[in-house]
């Protein structure tokens, strides 16, 4: 009952979202050359919400009236802070131009034995790695994910086979989802998908899973999306010095913090490693952001090149969590070329730290004291003690986490476009808008009665060959109704008891708009030698698909094999009896009435009763 109430409330909130947001701030983010900064971050710390701009640089924030400090961030550019006051029902156009970050690099003595200044910083970050790996004791947040894949080049032929004309350059997959993600140590996840949208379909559910794109460089081995069998070595892994070289490219100031920009360089081209940059915050030695790349040289499968960009921000309790993740990829195979991206935005964090506040200062002071000589190559690892938080309170009930990892609202794919427009944090590009419009138009056409009737006229044509091989089906696609009969070899049989047997069966099925369905199967049987008539009927009803609930009632007087698994098929027995003069079929007359009920009560657990 609580679950139903929750989903009802969420749907009401979504439908009323135009009234909830009283003001809009929107604009475009560009660089000094007025080129769009795709997927730049926009963040309001006081509200714990944010967004990213789209591929064309446009962003949009829907907020209540008030005064806010808005941060505009893009890796490699100076963070810009804008204070904005908005009134109720006001729309403000705020275009932003970000300047390239000017990195400062202190003078260092260069000699044959000196190491790059990046190494002491990396050692400090490695020493704190486990602290930050186990830092979030539990959290909940909202996650918006958008995925897009497009073809840019289509070959004329693949392995001498002509490519169909309907396969052409353009978007081939576009999806959005809005979920609530919950986490508790150790590695307990539970996700509720509230809304889902797939271009060209109002029935499909998005494959987006927030828990599946967890990309955590505090782990020794990173393998988000299962990009290869081994995973990839983190640049902060305990043995990362075996795989990487490091170079300090400079430092910059942001909100009173000093951030180091460190280039990570693979020692061997074909190791499962990253290339790019990692940004580390001075004194706390946390990850500030990442700008990484992996390619086929690193052993990545399915795609050619993958770019990973992350931004972190401080949440309640001092815990830093990712607020945005972007996976931008390029692919090429058999002459096809394409690209795409998945962007994940995290908002409304509720976090609880594993450690009391004084734990951080003690550990950080200890590390700083151990490294008074910057070139030292030995740093004591922090011994992570998984201490309880200040209180034993928790966000979740004891039974909240179970075998159910992903729950999908029954109406997740029914969210209307107007609602999506009000809750979507990343504006759609003109290309994406056109894709939704075109594919929705095609879908509406394909779901229309004239179109379905035209298909039925072709598919319902009677064919004697099919009647002998697979039977015959007559369908009303628009009404989602079908009538089917068995193939001839199942209707006409022969056995030594009944002689020639006539055994017709009619299967009637109907599916409704809410995906419930029923099936009615009347069947009769007449043996010419025994001169006996038998009959039975079976009725099944599935009111919904989420829990695979199924009601079934059957009964009648019919011929049944002694082995209930029916190991001998009618056509096989008829052939043996008529051609080999051998009969292996053993049957008896069965009169019965049966009712059954089945339902999944938990993930992997099904309840069934029958009488």
Regions found by a protein language model. Give the residues of each.
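Structured extracytoplasmic
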Residues: 102, 107-259, 265-274, 334-493, ...
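A short, solvent-exposed loop/turn motif at the edges and junctions
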Residues: 44-46, 71-83
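Structural motif
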Residues: 23-37
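Short, acidic Ser/Thr/Gly-rich low-complexity loop/linker segments typical of extracellular
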Residues: 47-58
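Repeated loop/turn-to-beta-strand initiation elements of outer-membrane beta-barrel proteins
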Residues: 512-519, 545-551, 603-607
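Outer-membrane beta-barrel translocator/channel fold
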Residues: 303-304, 331-340, 544-599
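Extracellular beta-sheet/turn segments enriched in Thr/Pro/Gly and aliphatic residues
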Residues: 85-113
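Transmembrane beta-strand segments that form the barrel wall of outer-membrane beta-barrel proteins
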Residues: 110, 291-296, 483-494, 505, ...
């Amino acid at each position: 009952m609580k679950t139903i109430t929750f989903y009802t409330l969420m749907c009401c909130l979504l439908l009323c979202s135009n009234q909830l947001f009283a003001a809009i701030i929107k604009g475009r983010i560009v660089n000094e050359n007025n080129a769009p900064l795709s997927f730049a971050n926009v963040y309001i710390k006081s509200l714990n919400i944010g967004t990213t701009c789209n591929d064309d640089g446009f962003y949009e924030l829907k907020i209540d009236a008030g005064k806010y400090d808005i941060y505009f961030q893009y890796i490699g550019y100076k963070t810009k802070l804008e204070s904005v006051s908005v009134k109720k029902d006001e729309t403000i156009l705020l275009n932003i131009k970000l300047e390239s970050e000017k990195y400062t690099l202190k003078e260092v003595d260069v000699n044959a034995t000196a190491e790059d200044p990046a190494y002491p910083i990396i050692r400090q970050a490695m020493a704190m790695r486990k602290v930050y790996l186990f830092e979030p004791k539990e959290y909940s947040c909202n996650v918006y994910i958008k995925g897009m894949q497009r073809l840019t080049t289509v070959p004329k032929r693949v392995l001498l086979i002509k490519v169909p004309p309907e396969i052409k350059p353009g978007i081939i997959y576009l999806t959005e989802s809005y979920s609530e993600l919950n986490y508790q140590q150790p590695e307990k996840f539970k996700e509720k998908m509230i809304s889902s949208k797939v271009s060209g379909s109002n029935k499909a559910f998005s494959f987006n899973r927030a828990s599946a794109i967890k990309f955590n460089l505090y782990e020794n081995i990173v393998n988000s999306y299962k990009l290869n069998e081994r995973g990839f070595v983190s640049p902060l892994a305990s043995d990362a010095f075996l795989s990487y070289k490091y170079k300090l490219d400079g430092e910059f100031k942001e909100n009173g913090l000093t951030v180091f920009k460190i280039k990570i360089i693979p020692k061997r081209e074909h190791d499962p490693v990253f290339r790019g940059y990692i940004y580390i915050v001075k004194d706390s030695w946390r990850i500030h952001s990442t700008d990484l790349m992996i390619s086929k040289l690193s052993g990545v499968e399915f795609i050619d090149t993958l770019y990973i960009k992350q931004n972190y921000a401080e949440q309640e309790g001092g815990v830093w969590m990712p607020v945005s993740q972007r996976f931008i990829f390029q692919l090429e195979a058999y002459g096809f070329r394409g690209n795409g991206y998945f962007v994940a935005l995290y908002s409304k964090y509720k976090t609880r730290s594993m450690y009391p506040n004084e734990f951080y200062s003690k550990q950080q002071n200890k590390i700083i004291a151990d490294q008074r000589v910057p070139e030292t190559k030995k740093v004591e690892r922090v011994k992570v003690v998984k201490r309880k938080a200040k209180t034993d309170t928790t966000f979740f009930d004891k039974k909240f986490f179970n075998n159910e990892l992903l729950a999908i609202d029954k109406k997740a794919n029914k969210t209307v476009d107007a609602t999506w427009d009000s809750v979507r944090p990343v504006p759609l590009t003109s290309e994406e808008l056109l894709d939704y419009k075109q594919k929705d138009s095609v879908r509406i056409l394909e779901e229309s009665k004239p179109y379905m009737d035209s298909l039925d006229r072709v598919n319902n044509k009677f064919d004697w060959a099919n009647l002998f091989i697979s039977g015959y089906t007559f369908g009303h696609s628009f009404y989602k109704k079908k009538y089917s009969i068995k193939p001839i070899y199942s209707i006409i049989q022969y056995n030594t008891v009944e002689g020639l047997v006539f055994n017709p069966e009619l299967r009637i099925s109907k599916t409704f708009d809410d995906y419930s369905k029923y099936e009615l199967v009347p069947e009769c049987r007449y043996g010419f030698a025994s001169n006996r008539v038998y009959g039975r009927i079976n009725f099944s009803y599935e009111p919904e698909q989420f829990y695979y609930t199924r009601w079934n009632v059957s009964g009648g007087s019919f011929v049944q094999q002694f082995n209930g698994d029916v190991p001998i098929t009618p056509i096989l027995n008829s052939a043996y009896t008529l051609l080999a003069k051998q009969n292996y079929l053993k049957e008896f007359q069965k009169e019965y009435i049966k009712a059954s009920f089945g339902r999944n009560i938990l993930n992997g657990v099904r309840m069934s009763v029958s009488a």
